[in-house]
């Protein structure tokens, strides 16, 4: 009897000793610069499918990167998600990401939408298009990014700061196509055409174009869709005054950027991190991830209304600016 009690006590001790390890395997610590309502369903579905609980910290990109760096080897973060290839490249250049070996991710995410060493992956895409006031310009006047620097547009162009990652990424893509000298000349021409000093975000540029404060600007596509889908009649009415051009259809195509993420080098839950990244590449998650910010799925086989809508409206050729950042580490 005594020996049976000893064996039982030993078994119970071993079982309780395993509990912390098992609990750790069922947790994912996510640092995310995304904050959309649809993400709640995205995360809860992952937990329901895998049993892995997500602990999420949201914040601005720069703040999260700085936090990860300050936490160092003791950081609890497993996955970092952000927007824009330049921000992913910056985190990678700081040595924050670890390569992920995953057949699922390599098969689902196109090569041009992931880091060559699989340090990070795109999970949605957006285009940086030209917008113009329909009463003042024709689409042919601004058919290409080059047109934004032409003297004919002097005093007619609005822009957010050139130092913003969205514009930095566009500039990097143009360097990839034109080279540094031509891109610098183009940038000087763009500055010479400013109707006012750069200010605000993309939505502010759309409003300025619609109001006639300037004739032309550039914007990420999801800002346009937000206004088109707005519950405010004045937003939808404003969009009737704005035309959209998918630039450079006769050459290299419209600049495409991404939202994405990767597994952190110091991740304490690496298996959970890989499972989560693979989940983000699933058909179900791709729809949630893209629709949350009116973007397109990174997985080309995923059907999505936004993709079909814009193809009907003239998007025939697009190019990603991701490659330049991947090679610049």
Name each region found by the language model.
Residues 75-80, 98-132, 146, 156-159:
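A structural signal for short loop-to-beta-strand junctions that line the ligand-binding cleft
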Residues 259-318:
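Mature extracytoplasmic/periplasmic domains
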Residues 166-167, 173-247:
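Ligand-binding pocket segment of bilobal, Venus flytrap-like solute-binding proteins
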Residues 24-89:
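Early extracytoplasmic/lumenal segment of secretory-pathway proteins
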Residues 19-23:
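Sec/Tat signal peptide C-region and signal peptidase I cleavage site
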Residues 88-96, 115-143, 171-172, 256-262:
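Periplasmic solute-binding protein
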Residues 31-34, 98-106, 116-117, 120-121, 132-134, 140, 146-149, 233-255, ...:
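Short beta-strand->loop
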């Amino acid at each position: 009897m005594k020996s049976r009690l000893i064996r039982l006590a030993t078994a119970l001790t071993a079982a309780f000793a395993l509990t912390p390890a098992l609990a750790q395997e069922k947790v994912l610590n996510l640092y995310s610069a995304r904050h959309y309502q649809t993400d709640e369903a995205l995360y809860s579905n992952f937990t329901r499918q895998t049993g892995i609980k997500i602990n999420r910290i949201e914040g601005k990109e720069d703040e999260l990167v700085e936090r990860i760096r300050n936490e160092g080897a003791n950081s609890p973060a497993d996955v970092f998600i952000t927007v824009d290839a330049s921000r992913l490249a910056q985190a990678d250049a700081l040595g924050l990401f670890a390569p992920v070996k995953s057949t699922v991710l390599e098969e689902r995410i196109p090569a041009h939408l992931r880091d060559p060493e699989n340090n990070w992956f795109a999970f949605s895409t957006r285009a940086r298009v030209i917008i113009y006031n329909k009463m003042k310009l024709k689409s042919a006047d601004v058919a290409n990014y080059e047109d934004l620097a032409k003297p004919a547009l002097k005093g007619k162009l609005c822009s957010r700061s050139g130092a913003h990652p969205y514009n930095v990424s566009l500039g990097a893509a143009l360097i990839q196509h034109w080279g540094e000298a031509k891109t610098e000349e183009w940038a000087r021409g763009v500055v010479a055409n400013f109707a006012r000093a750069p200010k605000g975000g993309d939505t502010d540029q759309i409003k300025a174009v619609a109001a006639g404060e300037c004739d032309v600007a550039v914007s990420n596509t999801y800002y346009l869709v937000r206004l088109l889908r707005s519950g405010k009649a004045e937003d939808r009415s404003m969009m009737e005054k704005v035309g959209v051009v998918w630039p450079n259809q006769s050459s290299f195509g419209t600049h495409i950027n991404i939202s994405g993420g990767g597994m952190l080098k110091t991740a304490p839950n690496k298996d959970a991190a890989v499972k989560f990244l693979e989940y983000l590449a699933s058909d179900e998650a791709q729809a949630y991830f893209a629709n949350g910010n009116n973007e397109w799925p990174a997985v080309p086989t995923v059907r999505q209304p936004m993709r079909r809508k814009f193809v009907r409206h003239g998007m025939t050729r697009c190019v990603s600016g991701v490659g330049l950042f991947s090679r610049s580490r």
